[in-house]
From Swiss-Prot:
Catalytic activity: L-aspartate 4-semialdehyde + pyruvate = (2S,4S)-4-hydroxy-2,3,4,5-tetrahydrodipicolinate + H2O + H(+)
Active site: Y136, K164
Reported function: Catalyzes the condensation of (S)-aspartate-beta-semialdehyde [(S)-ASA] and pyruvate to 4-hydroxy-tetrahydrodipicolinate (HTPA).
Name assigned to this protein: 4-hydroxy-tetrahydrodipicolinate synthase
Gene: dapA
Binding-site positions, pyruvate: T48, I204
Entry's Gene Ontology BP terms: diaminopimelate biosynthetic process; lysine biosynthetic process via diaminopimelate
Pathway annotation: Amino-acid biosynthesis; L-lysine biosynthesis via DAP pathway; (S)-tetrahydrodipicolinate from L-aspartate: step 3/4
Gene3D superfamilies xref list: Aldolase class I (3.20.20.70)
Assembly information from the UniProt record: Homotetramer; dimer of dimers.
Main location: cytoplasm
Gene source species: Acetivibrio thermocellus (strain ATCC 27405 / DSM 1237 / JCM 9322 / NBRC 103400 / NCIMB 10682 / NRRL B-4536 / VPI 7372)
Keyword Repeat attached: no
């Protein structure tokens, strides 16, 4: 019986940048903040971490630093996805080598593929390492959806243990046809409770960058049986979540963190600063929630 890598809230942590590269001192501070506030897992070098703008050397260095800084206090899941299967294998092997607890692998994007191609892509990655693999399905970004029947096939591979699912419409089918020890995590902060109600085990969250404790509570209250309290927390956070996705993520969450005094720097191009109008909406929302 495979155990979940984590249950609860994992943070899809941002990567703080300066003009010269990664701000490792700040990254260390953010990691300590997350662990202190009760986060259940740290997911590094994902979409929110802007891995797509990192050269391999930097990408690998961030994974290594995070693993060493966390030092087994919570599971570290390293984003190692690529639309080049061999490249994804290389990054995944490195993550395993430096001690990551699992890898997160997004579907190939731009060149896309067929469902058979998806199966072969993830199968080769999984066979190249021994640590657990979390599939990442985000069709709104990649233009490619892992169909439930393909997820079921992949879930039969021993170390493909979970999926971060952003297509909420197929969560029920995935959970109903996959093995009971296959874990489903929400990839949408506004749909955590619905996913948990269907049998999911947690969320890989953007909003946890600024409210890790509350994000943990959102999931923990549900899993502890207090569904009504979890529902109330989910609804209470909707306006904040809306503001955090008013522009392409992670633009707003980084802006929010800077407004909160965390000094995480800007996003890298092609991501740009928020429009003045949206920035003011975000700022007012943070004030409404008592975050600034």
């Amino acid at each position: 019986m495979r155990k979940p890598i984590f249950t609860g809230a994992g943070v899809a942590i941002i990567t703080p940048f300066t003009e010269n590269g990664v701000n490792y001192d700040k990254l260390g501070e953010l990691i300590e903040f997350q662990i202190r506030e009760g986060i259940d897992s740290i997911i590094i070098c994902g979409t929110t971490g802007e891995a797509s703008t990192m050269p391999d050397e930097e990408h690998k260095a961030v994974i290594k630093y995070t693993v060493e800084k966390v030092n087994k206090r919570v599971p570290v899941i390293a984003g190692t996805g690529s639309n080049d299967t061999i490249h994804a294998v290389e990054l995944s092997k490195y993550a395993e080598e430096v001690g990551a607890d699992a890898i997160l692998s997004v579907t190939p994007y731009y060149n896309k593929t067929t469902q058979k191609g998806l199966y072969e892509h993830f199968k080769l990655i999984a066979e190249s390492i021994k640590i657990p693999v979390v599939l990442y399905n985000v069709p709104g970004r990649t233009g490619l959806n892992i169909e439930p029947k393909t997820v079921k096939q992949l879930a039969e591979i021993e170390n493909i243990v979970a999926i971060k699912e952003c297509n909420i419409n197929q969560v029920g089918e995935i959970i109903s046809i996959c093995p009971p020890d296959f874990t489903v995590y929400s990839g949408n902060d506004d749909m955590v409770v619905p996913l948990l109600a269907l049998g999911g085990k947690g969320v890989i969250s953007v909003m946890a960058n600024i409210i890790p404790k509350k994000t943990h509570e959102l999931v923990a209250t549900f899993l502890d049986g207090n569904v009504e309290e979890s529902r109330k927390i989910q609804l209470s956070l909707l306006n904040l979540i809306k503001a955090l996705f008013i522009e392409v993520s992670p633009i707003p969450v980084k802006a929010a963190m800077n407004l909160m005094g965390m000094e995480v720097g800007k996003c890298r191009l092609p991501l740009t600063d928020m429009t003045e109008k949206n920035f003011e909406i975000l700022k007012q929302t943070l004030k409404d929630y008592g975050l600034i």
